Amino acid sequence: MLNFELYIPTKLYFGRGQCGRVGEIAAGRGFRRALICYGGGSAVRSGLLERIKTSLDASGVEHDEFGGIQANPTAECCARMAGFARERGSDLLLAVGGGSVIDTAKMAAHCVRTGRDPWDYTEHRAEPTDSLPVGVVLTIAATGSETSDSAVLTNTATGVKRGLSSEKNRPLFAIMDPELTMTLPPYQTACGIVDILMHTMERYMCTNPDNELIDRISEGLLTSVIDAGRRVMAEPADYEARATLMLAGSLSHNGLTGAGRACGLWAHKLEHEMSALDDRIAHGAGLAVVWPAYLEFFARRGLFTERLERYAEKIWGERTVEGGIEATREYFRSFGMPERLSDFGLTAEDAEYMSCRCTDDGKKTFPSVLPLGLEEVREIYSLCL
């Protein structure tokens, strides 16, 4: 087990009916004016937004609204949110939604007081120092952004997608009511399941295997999510399965399953190029295409063999590496996830473009058991075609 630091300050309010406490929670922490941030309108149609405003009103917390945040959020939208929060005198950004809404709020929070462009932070021209607090009302189990230190934005002017990892990104509190996820479309639920799995699967495929405690925590999380995923897709109103997915989403990406490991989220890097190229590609759907190909790439070279064998046996109950990879594909397939780049309309030419973008035309290499440069990334994308 390698040395590590782990700091998870986000307070969770978990369970049925917790969203009704948002006013009490915000007022109890001294907030006086919240900016409610949300996405495409489901929060309005479901009545959730009205319930949140009623709760804030009852506790004397003033509020404004910033809606229309899209999937695969943009730096431009983030800058508009920061400007509006500054204009309205907001002292809390309240993100109502999933990863896209939360990530936009996180990055906007760094810009409200400083007036900086959010891209300054993703490009490390500045470090977050004076950030507005962020609270979350979570509506989908997926990214784990409600407790993570990361946020991802796309610059529409350049088509570049970048992330920022910073302890300043961790929300102050997160309200997590599994019942809010029961009306999600099946495809969106399935994309979330893949995303939850991937945050731990990538960390599990580490280059230092001597970390039995974190291995077993990871295996327990993954097998629990696999089981809960099957249950939820068969019965969307299964509360216990929904609760398992929602909590697992946080645990999978708050740093716990990477503690003491040497690992990188390189399959995520490859997927980011896909959704940067076409923002209609859901992150989880893209990962469902990349991950089996990523594993196959290493298996063909006889690399990560012990890890891949353990992955096959402990996660999928398979005796061979090939069996584990196929079981992964079959699980994703059972939810209707895409299997190939062509399922998104992406071509070999697109794969070449993404390979060059991902590695900055070969100038960038990702550290792994085999360093991943331009040629390696090309091959992984080719296995996705």
What residue ranges belong to the model's regions?
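ATP/NTP phosphate-donor binding region
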Residues: 1-92, 341
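A glycine/threonine-rich phosphate-anchoring loop and its flanking beta-alpha core
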Residues: 20, 111-210, 306
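Glycine-rich beta-strand-to-loop/alpha-helix junction loops that act as flexible
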Residues: 38-40, 96-98, 248
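Glycine/serine-rich anion-binding loops at beta->alpha junctions
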Residues: 90-106, 139-145, 280-281
